[in-house]
């Protein structure tokens, strides 16, 4: 049988839904590829459990691909003392609650107790993943800019300029980030 590629986007702390979805995917880890497109945390009720589950999956199946999303980017900035209010306004409080079990003030600078293996996971996330036919990325690509010249901010955050573009990127782009009622399937891209 042909090798398959499965892509999962924007879990946002929904651990139960992730487990249900993983139980339905007919994946053969020895042949197929599984790509997670970022945004594992924030908004949903169980970000800690989601990250824990993904780390265990990565330990069992090292070939699974994990991309960085804009929410992991916001967490990184939050932990480094930048853009704290932005993070809290974008669903970050759920992640903080999940790790801390107490509310956090945006101006608090005391150590945030993320387990080392979770920090390692966040640091290991890739910005994109490329195959012969596809480019997987969290948010999208800026039209008319070669992949190697793409700006990190665009890979994690771009929306309308990419989603509305008919530009041929040379390969079909598989992306998450932009909320869609159903998958967007176009010749140059698939939004999930």
Question: In which residue ranges do the predicted regions lie?
Answer:
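N-terminal active-site segment of His-dependent metallophosphoesterases
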Residues: 1-53
